[in-house]
Swiss-Prot record:
It is found in: Cytoplasm. One of its GO terms (cellular component) is cytosol. GO terms for biological process: methionyl-tRNA aminoacylation. Zn(2+) binds at C148, C151, C161, C164. This is Methionine--tRNA ligase.
């Protein structure tokens, strides 16, 4: 690896239908810490982001708001800066997928795919789609609802059932209706464009690319399953990858396909191209040549994403780039989902964290940056923000262990020694500082590997050593006797130098505090290898305050009843409430606590898991559930869930399903991704009825 590297780093593009939430910020902070560390190493980094602005949901939301789609996404973009600045996110550029650069690059990539290999990578096919005659538009699958043709659950989407996990074509839905108008849609034929992901050139490339270290092991293992058997809408099975429908029909807010009037790129084709467009826009503003930059063989390309969009970034995106003759990513770094106190974020229940409210309450952005860093690892794992844990970690680690090192020594140095430090550290002081300096490479390795939790733990262990030195030498006792002046000077000088070293190690996580500390100790905190002893300090200013219980209470205070009522008018969970039922109707559904005895992936399906359940009836049941995107089989074994025990068995192509487990998800999965398997409280036993 060259001593000076050239890196192009991105985060997933947020959909431009609302403000940032904590999940966005977690990803941006994760990437920002890594980027700041790379810059401290002297590497050249271009770190970019953009709004994902296209698609039917944007077009429909804009219409409801009485705006053009362009005005709607511009208004969303105007609200990004307070988040980016407030949480010290060091993006070099924030752009939009509706920008000219993205239109140009998306069309060029398409042309290159179309024109390579005798045009065999792009294929036109006539398909049947549902058309809303009232809206005069073809309906995306997510805007068609009806009865599942397999389990007969009501109000299921047009492509898969969230109750039984079945995958089907929209035309198979029973009694379909348009979610936009409530009208009965009509089946009409339309010519669509397909990228032939099943082409042997795609398959062979992706099998190599996804298994050569570019993905975390657990992600690579998941992707490997997708090259096996796949299920078709007609119930048959075939082997390999499905071709990808990359077009949508007008009216559509997006990028029109070259030489195909009225046809637009599907949003997931042009969205990742937005990474390149944001970079191109940045380089052009600097007077640099984009093509020359991307052609440099030394360039490294990295994407930070959530686990809900792995398919697009590990199959479609690298295949598009490779087969259009472009550089492919060096790594795709996947993270899990975030909960608060073990619950999915919800403003109405007081379990949401509004980032701007956090800042408006005077809460330090770097408290959150540090806390998330302590939880982040290189694995694709979910993480939880516990409010009590948050307060304890910030107050104990950052204030008690770290900042207090400087505050304990600064006053004595300023009052007794005019802020000057001695270079005589004594044997114990030299040994302590040597320990701190000796950890530099280990901490750097943890940062490089995105093991921020391990890096922060290592730093706090060093802080413990410094505080043990304080307790042994007791500078407050030394200060009581003028005869101890030399010893006091020595101890306080060691502490300030230790504080400077710890600050440099924490600088990727706490950039604002590091800048303030830089002014305090007179050392460069932006270079990892900066060294030398601190010569003098400026008068000490408070660097960080403690978190208070009152701040946390205000942050997580649920909205007033009137606000909750207003929010309810916007459809809770993204779906209108179902018609009311009587207690007799509910009593017919037998819900039981079930122990998950075993769980495994289903060959040929990317959505289903096969669960073996015990509800205490003397036998075990097999149930299929469409939760594979959110749950690892090994994590579920031994846990309890809730199942519908009296649902008639139904035969799927993978086997017979003898019930249904309960899971929750938002109506708009793109804006609010995640599937959450329900679990009973502690003490519940298999077979207990849920009433």
């Amino acid at each position: 690896m060259p001593s000076t590297r050239k890196l192009f780093v991105t985060t997933a593009l947020p959909y431009a239908n609302g403000p940032f939430h904590l999940g966005h910020l977690m990803e941006y902070i994760q990437a920002d810490i890594w980027v700041r560390f790379q810059r401290m190493q002297g590497h050249e980094v271009n770190f970019v982001g953009a709004d994902d602005t296209h698609g039917a949901p944007i077009m429909i939301a804009a219409e409801k708001a009485g705006k053009t789609p362009q005005q709607f996404v511009a208004d969303i973009a105007a609200g990004r800066k307070p988040y980016l600045d407030g949480f010290h996110l060091s993006f070099d550029n924030w752009h939009s997928t509706d920008a000219p650069e993205n239109h140009e690059l998306a069309r060029q990539i398409y042309r290159d795919l179309r024109d390579r290999a005798d045009g065999s990578l792009i294929e036109r096919r006539s398909i049947e789609q549902f058309f809303d005659p009232g809206k005069s538009m073809f309906l995306p699958d997510r805007y068609i609802v009806g009865e599942c043709p397999r389990c007969h659950a009501k109000e299921q989407y047009g492509d898969n059932c969230e109750q039984c996990g079945s995958v089907y074509a929209p035309a198979e839905l029973i009694d379909p209706v348009s979610a936009l108008s409530g009208a009965k849609p009509e089946l009409r034929s339309s010519e669509h464009f397909f990228f032939k992901l099943s082409d042997p050139r795609c398959v062979e490339f992706l099998q190599r690319w996804t298994q050569d270290g570019k993905l975390q092991p657990e992600v690579a293992n998941k992707v490997r399953e997708w090259f096996g058997l796949r299920s078709n809408p007609d119930g048959s099975c075939s082997e390999g990858l499905d071709d990808w429908d990359i077009s949508r029909d007008a009216p559509y807010f997006g990028i029109e396909i070259p030489d195909a009037p009225g046809k637009y790129f599907y949003v997931w084709l042009d969205a990742p191209v937005g990474y390149l467009a944001a970079l191109k826009n940045l380089l052009e503003k600097r007077g640099q040549n984009y093509d020359a930059y991307m052609a440099d063989p030394a360039l490294e390309q990295y994407h930070f994403i959530g686990k809900d969009i792995v398919t697009f970034h590990t199959l479609f995106w690298p295949a598009m780039l490779h087969l259009s003759g472009r550089k492919t990513p060096d790594n795709v770094f996947v993270h899990g989902f975030l909960t608060i106190n073990g619950e999915k974020m919800s403003k109405s229940r007081g379990t949401g964290l509004d980032p701007l409210k956090y800042l408006s309450l005077g809460m330090n952005a770097e408290w959150l940056r540090y806390y998330l860093a302590t939880k982040l690892s290189a694995r694709n794992e979910d993480m939880d923000l516990g409010t009590e844990d948050f307060m304890v970690r910030v107050n104990s680690d950052l204030i008690g262990k770290y900042v207090n090192i400087a505050s304990r020594a600064a006053g004595f140095l300023t009052k007794r020694f005019a802020g000057r430090l001695t270079s005589d550290f004594g044997a114990a002081g030299l040994a302590l500082l040597a320990d701190l300096h000796g950890a530099r490479d280990t901490i750097a390795q943890w940062y490089q590997a995105r093991e921020f939790g391990k890096a922060t733990r290592e730093i706090m262990l060093l802080a413990d050593k410094v505080n043990a030195y304080v307790d042994r030498n007791k500078p407050w006792e030394l200060a009581k006797d003028a005869a101890n002046g030399q010893a006091l000077h020595q101890v306080c000088s060691v502490l300030i130098n230790a504080f400077a070293t710890l600050t440099r190690y924490l600088s990727p996580v706490l950039p604002a505090l590091a800048r303030a500390a830089q002014d305090f100790v007179g050392q460069d905190m932006q270079r990892w290898d900066a060294g030398g002893a601190v010569q003098a300090i400026a008068p000490y200013q408070h660097l960080m305050q403690r978190v208070t219980p009152e701040q946390l209470a205000a942050l997580f205070q649920p909205p007033a009843a009137a606000q909750i009522a207003a929010a309810g008018a916007q459809e809770p969970g993204g779906l209108a409430l179902a018609p009311g039922i009587g207690i007799d109707d509910f009593d017919r559904v037998d819900l039981r606590v079930a122990l998950i005895v075993d769980c495994a992936a289903v060959a040929g399906s990317t959505k289903l898991l096969r669960l073996t359940l015990d509800i205490g009836e003397g036998r075990q049941r097999q149930v299929f559930s469409g939760i594979a995107s959110a749950c690892q089989p090994a994590d579920l074994i031994g846990k309890h869930t809730v199942m519908v025990a009296n649902l008639a068995p139904r035969r799927l192509k993978f086997g017979v399903s003898e019930g249904m487990v309960l899971a929750a998800s938002h109506g708009d999965e793109k804006a609010n991704p995640g599937i959450y398997l329900l679990a009973p409280g502690p003490g519940a036993k298999p077979g207990m009825r849920v009433r």
